[in-house]
């Protein structure tokens, strides 16, 4: 894996982007490698969760993004295991320094009763498309945001995250 995330031999000639960065960001999310994820983030991210019942941030700081995704109410929950698989993808070149990746995703989630990960409490999987935004900063491609759109969910996806919008609605 090209750790610097610069375009490599696998670079798409039309976009100038590297498929390595999209693989890297999903690997980091699936393994919960927060340091590696932080290393590929742009200083500010466009985060649009409106299609999944949450908010939109036009310029969320990388630190705030990390705090959100690594929080115990989200992917930082030690009882949640996840794997994000990328399906069909196409790249849209916006400029020499901005690319949008359009990705088909399946995100599998399993919640355990305790951090020892021995007993499964529930499963929840999501099938979605996702726009990922990438910017080139100092010659290096960085992950600059996302905009998911869920097509459909399996099992009890709405119960996977303690901080999920459905959990919040149950308490209001």
From Swiss-Prot:
Gene Ontology MF term list: scytalone dehydratase activity
Principal EC category: lyase
Keywords carried by this UniProt record: Lyase
Pfam families in alphabetical order: Scytalone_dh
Keyword check for RNA-binding: no
Family, as annotated: Belongs to the scytalone dehydratase family.
Physiological role: Scytalone dehydratase-like protein; part of the Pks2 gene cluster that mediates the formation of infectious structures (appressoria), enabling these fungi to kill insects faster. The product of the Pks2 gene cluster is different from the one of Pks1 and has still not been identified.
Protein name (record): Scytalone dehydratase-like protein Arp1
Lineage per the UniProt record: Eukaryota, Fungi, Dikarya, Ascomycota, Pezizomycotina
